[in-house]
């Protein structure tokens, strides 16, 4: 079983397209707000465990095992967000941090039951796709920057940024 810290690194690698491309330690350092030597050390541990591969001067990317494990973490996180909103009546700006804590602590059986309880949803409350069968492709990738002022759009995906969610909730 991986530590929370290692799982957070795997998610950071995937978030920075590390399923297809190499991600530099500098990018991970900035993304995670962690000093570069610490990133290098953790990447070494993840590589030794078989979750990532590294290439000198290119960076790190997820292996097949690393991607499988990372998608499982994301599935847990997104199901928890939905559960917290739909069942426990949390506000959507509150759920990300709660899910961050809980995603590392629930069993596979709990995830299966949660998925069933929620009727096998396709997306989390923020519009992020819930991975299934080791597949992960976001549905909503067009940004609002692609539209002109006055265009009528429906927002289907927002990032889990607390300040943004609070702002949107107030409108």
Residue spans for each PLM region:
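N-terminal helix-turn-helix DNA-binding core of bacterial DNA-binding proteins
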Residues: 2-34
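Key DNA-contact positions within bacterial/archaeal DNA-binding proteins
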Residues: 37
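Short, hydrophobic-biased segments on the C-terminal half of alpha helices
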Residues: 43-44
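A short, conserved structural fragment
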Residues: 47-55
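Basic, amphipathic "hinge/linker" alpha-helix immediately C-terminal to the N-terminal HTH DNA-binding motif
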Residues: 58-77
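Ordered, amphipathic secondary-structure segments that act as subunit-interaction surfaces
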Residues: 75-111
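Mid-protein regulatory/catalytic core that forms ligand/cofactor-binding pockets
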Residues: 104-171
């Amino acid at each position: 079983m991986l530590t929370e810290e290692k799982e957070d690194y795997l998610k950071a690698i995937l978030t920075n397209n590390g399923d297809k491309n190499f991600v530099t330690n500098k990018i991970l350092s900035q993304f995670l707000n962690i000093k570069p030597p610490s990133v290098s050390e953790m990447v070494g541990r993840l590589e030794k465990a078989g979750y990532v591969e590294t290439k000198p001067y290119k960076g790190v990317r997820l292996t097949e095992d690393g991607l499988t494990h990372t998608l499982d973490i994301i599935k847990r996180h997104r199901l928890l967000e939905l559960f917290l909103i739909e069942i426990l009546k949390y506000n959507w700006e509150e759920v990300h941090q709660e899910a961050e804590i809980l995603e590392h602590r629930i069993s596979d059986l709990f995830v299966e039951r949660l998925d069933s309880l929620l009727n096998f949803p396709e997306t989390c409350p923020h519009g992020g796709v819930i991975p299934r069968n080791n597949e992960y492709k976001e549905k909503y990738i067009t940004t609002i920057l692609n539209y002109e002022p006055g265009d009528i759009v429906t927002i289907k995906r927002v990032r889990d940024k607390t300040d943004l969610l609070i702002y949107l909730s107030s409108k």
